[in-house]
Amino acid sequence: MQSVFEQIARSLKKRRAMLFVGAGVSMSVGLPPWRKLIEHMADDLGLDDQTVGMPDTTYQALAEYYRLKHGSIGPLRSWMDREWSVSRDKVKRSEIHKLIVSLDFPIIYTTNYDRNLEAAFEIYGRPFVKIANAKDIAKVNGDLTQIIKYHGDFDDDTSLVLAETDYFDRLSFDSPLDVKFRADALGRTILFVGYSMSDMNIRLLLHRLWQTWRLSGYERDRPKSFVFMPGPNVVQEAVLGRWGLNVVAGDDEDPQQSLAAFLS
């Protein structure tokens, strides 16, 4: 039986592999955690700690309230654009970003808003096309790596999936980017990195993908897909395994070191 590395390498050689990049990759170069975003919104909106600390006060709900109060998400996007950015030098020093570029995935999806992936490709002189909305899909060139900003991009406020309504709209999975994802994913090996698997949108996406294959009657022909996790998790291994996803667990206490070791 082929190892995980051999299966991914074979799919890469055939240009039939895609990478899905989560927040853990951005945090590896110093991007702040979601708690900082929550604190900023609470301070801007004049909310006390008790309100913000309530179990049902999610960052998505706060962003929705922010949009209602300010009329748009624009000011918050501008703040995030400043705070959710790191120097190109930090990206250049990132072993994880260097490895992602060198692995040469033809298609990369990310739920991160920042420009770190794009910066890494520019630093190493690798051409790419960024896709954040329906208009960008027309730019697709089969010879260039595609970086699909699945939850939007700071260059386009309307593309951001940030507030609660944005997430609910995304749950229908019928936007142009969702249609593209299904088309890209059905015939390819997928590797998910940088995810804690706590994002219900991603979990629902994985479930929908499994359901599509199951209902097709050709589930046995589905390409292998993998989820990298920094350490073992028997619950996730069982649940994701039910959906046809293979969990690959790292063995380093440091999540970033664990991911870098896996990618290398």
Short names for language-model regions:
Residues 19, 27, 31-84, 127, ...:
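A phosphate-binding glycine/aspartate-rich beta-alpha loop in the early core of alpha/beta enzymes
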Residues 1-19, 25-29, 40, 44, ...:
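SIR2/sirtuin-family catalytic core signature
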